[in-house]
Design a protein with these regions (language model features):
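Solvent-exposed loop/turn segments at secondary-structure junctions
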Residues: 89-91, 102-103, 230-234, 269-275, ...
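Von Willebrand factor
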Residues: 218-337, 339-340, 347, 378, 381, 386
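Acidic, polar low-complexity linker/tail segments
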Residues: 171-225, 231-239, 251-254
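P/S/T/G-enriched low-complexity
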Residues: 366, 380-652
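Loop/turn elements at helix/coil->beta-strand transitions in domains of secreted/extracellular proteins
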Residues: 222, 258-264, 295, 306, ...
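Extracytoplasmic, non-cytosolic globular domains
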Residues: 242-249, 253, 326, 340-349, ...
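SH3/SH3-like beta-barrel superfamily modules
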Residues: 22-27, 58-99, 144, 148-189, ...
Length: 652
């Protein structure tokens, strides 16, 4: 990192050409309005069929959500048609009815957040209705519209045409797209919001069963994996964890619910390169299948002992243990998924040369959320690490933050074993009770915690809220909740009742091959900068070119940066940067970064920025390898064409 920063400060000569961009065909698609380089694109909707000529017969089925360039528009007998191609170099594929497509002039799509802490999103027929409602900020009018939509009783003249489904929709299981077509900045009170024109399209598989059977309450299960620091001095906490798990198995046995809560255990130490005497970096002692039985779990963890020698410093590779728990466990069948990290040391982040994962806090948390895993942290605030308490606590609070719930962090004062045990019993017991109540088809109450430990009471409140949300997700599977199929609607990206709360996550749809290419290009840009082949200005231009391409037209990756297309061929060099960025509704962190900004930053801030870029490279590699997250739109096995909507904040 120091070498990379020094190279950027020196500002040496730009990178030489590596390869030339292929010559474009004279047969080009239609340009977007007001653009000179960006072409019109569309996505095929599920059920679309292509013909060789407009109005012709002998159609062929098109894979849902395939991106096409638009080469011609034609109206025949009142029906509008598009001639489309697979690239922008003249490869025309055929004709599609315009009704079988949606605009796709950039790759940004919205994903509905779980409405656990905000109202469901209302979809309006026109933007004037939303504008007027936002201007008046009249909760009485809003409540009437909301209740009518929620009850399915909106009148024919209501401005509301649809509402977000009541429960969380897991995009991995029920894939959908909400492409953002236009946007407008408005205010809800004093909060800035965006008014979005969208299309909402679920992926409706033909092979999906027509009848959805009600889920069985007794089948609701939780997977809870302990990730325990097993370095020197951790023996009392390891023993207390065994004790807590043994109690829970007894409780589950009494309730005849063994198998409804499965436990796993991963132990971690530190990088063996710096401390080979530690024996291992991370080791799985019990997986979730083995942890369905108490006797099996306890026998397998008998051999877990704390190390007898210390690691190199007060930081340890906790993220290696968490990542192993996320990746090595079979979470299938567990509706509630938890990792409980127990440690007295700070974690080695992406900027630490001894980090084995290359992941920082944000990217590891995102990887967990991609897999539907909530991370708890029981942070032992021992006297030995007092100097690092504040820094480490900030790191772990961020790691344990769960969307719309809050941070699942608990700092154990002085590392007291009894207080640790009390917190562990409370959290694990609460999760077990949630499963017991669900199995008996009871109402999951949201009790006010009675602990006189304010920090623990706050954590228990969040555990209750999280458990309720996860159970609601499970029960609402029976409702077959899909996003509404709406070709043209307007919505707000903020909660009308509480405008400080976002209701959407912004994502970019990429194929697995495109993510791999993004990984390689970003790594090359960072490597070339470290070698001194990019000036600060050229470095920023490369990052901006890459970010703009990913958001606007990811199939062009490899042709819009000097690193891959040769000197003078980046978007910035060609003068196309503004065209790519100017009307995007959302942008990543590099888009608005200027050379003046960079040069005004402190060295620490520059280093933090570079660390984030390197961390994203590691995240792309990890995400690419998680086969279960990728969606094959044609229903086939996972391939390079499989897709996943990447969170915008994880892109450059």
């Amino acid at each position: 990192m120091k070498k990379l920063l020094m190279a950027l400060m020196l500002g040496m000569t730009p990178l030489l050409a590596i390869c030339a961009e292929p010559a474009a065909s004279a047969d080009k698609p239609l340009l977007m309005a007001g653009k000179h380089e960006l072409y019109q694109r569309v996505l095929s909707v599920p059920g679309a069929r292509m013909v060789k000529e407009a109005g012709g017969k002998g159609s062929t089925e098109v894979t849902p959500f395939t991106a096409f360039y638009v080469y011609a528009r034609f109206t025949l007998d009142g029906k509008q048609w598009l001639e489309v191609g697979t690239d922008r170099h003249g490869s025309r594929a055929g004709w599609l009815p315009i009704a079988s497509t949606i605009e796709w002039n950039h790759g940004l799509t919205a994903a509905f957040r779980d409405p656990v802490s905000h109202d469901r999103v209302l979809l309006f027929k026109d933007k004037e209705s939303v504008r007027e409602l936002a201007r008046q900020k009249d909760l009485t009018v809003y409540d009437k519209l909301y209740q009518e939509a929620a009850q399915g009783k909106s009148s024919a003249d209501s401005p509301v045409i649809a509402i977000q489904p009541p429960g969380y929709i897991d995009i991995r299981e029920d894939f959908y797209l909400v492409p953002i077509r236009q946007h407008e900045d408005i205010y809800l009170g004093s909060e800035r919001a965006r008014l979005l024109q969208i299309s909402s399209v679920p992926l409706e598989r033909e092979q999906a069963a027509p009848d959805v059977k009600p889920v069985a309450a007794k089948d609701y299960s939780a997977g809870l994996v302990f990730v325990i620091d097993s370095t020197l001095s951790m023996e009392p906490y390891i023993e207390r964890t065994r004790e807590a798990v043994e109690k829970i198995y007894d409780t589950l046995g009494d309730a005849k619910l063994l198998g409804n809560v499965n436990f796993g255990l991963v132990a971690f130490r530190d990088n063996l390169a710096s401390a080979p005497q530690l024996d291992y970096l991370a080791r799985t002692y019990v997986n979730l299948e083995q942890g369905s039985n108490g006797a099996d779990f306890l026998s397998r963890v008998k051999s877990l002992k704390a190390a007898t020698t210390s690691s190199r410093d007060f930081n340890e590779d906790a993220y290696a243990g968490v990542k192993q728990a996320i990746e090595s466990m079979n979470w299938t069948g567990h509706e509630a998924r938890y990792v409980v990290l127990v440690t007295d040391a700070g974690a080695r982040g992406a900027d630490d040369p001894l980090s084995s994962t290359g992941l920082g806090t944000a990217s590891l948390r995102q990887l967990a959320q991609d897999k539907g895993v909530a991370i708890f942290v029981l942070h032992l605030l021992t006297p030995a690490t007092m100097a690092d308490h504040a820094r480490d606590a900030e790191q772990y609070r961020e790691l344990a933050d769960f969307p719309d719930i809050g941070s699942l962090y608990y700092g154990v004062p002085t590392g007291d074993v009894n207080k640790f045990g009390k917190a562990l019993d409370a959290v694990a017991g609460q999760i077990t009770e949630q499963v017991r109540v669900a199995a008996n088809d009871g109402e999951l109450a949201m009790p006010v915690p009675t602990s006189d430990d304010v920090q623990l009471a706050n954590l228990q409140s969040r555990v209750a809220k999280l458990g309720h949300a996860l159970r609601m997700r499970y029960l609402q599977k029976a409702e077959g909740g899909q996003v509404p199929s709406v070709f043209d609607a307007w919505m707000l990206d903020r909660d009308f009742r509480g405008p400080e709360r976002p209701t959407l996550d912004v994502r970019v749809l990429l194929t697995r091959d495109q993510l791999s290419e993004l990984h390689d290009i970003l790594k090359q840009v960072l490597d070339k900068a470290e070698e001194g082949l990019l000036s600060p200005q050229n470095f920023l231009n490369e990052l901006k070119s890459l970010a703009a391409t990913v958001s606007r037209s990811p199939e062009q990756l490899g042709t819009t940066t000097a690193t891959t297309a040769g000197k003078g061929n980046s978007l910035a060099d060609l003068g196309f940067m503004r065209e790519y960025i100017e009307d995007l509704p959302y942008t990543g962190e590099v888009m608005g970064l200027s050379l003046d900004d960079w040069q005004s930053w402190s060295t620490l801030r520059q280093v933090a920025f570079l660390n984030r870029m390197e961390e994203k490279v590691s995240y792309y590699r990890a995400l690419h390898d998680h086969i279960d997250l990728w969606v094959s739109l044609d229903g086939g096995p996972v391939s390079g064409d499989s897709v996943y909507p990447i969170p915008l904040e994880m892109l450059p």
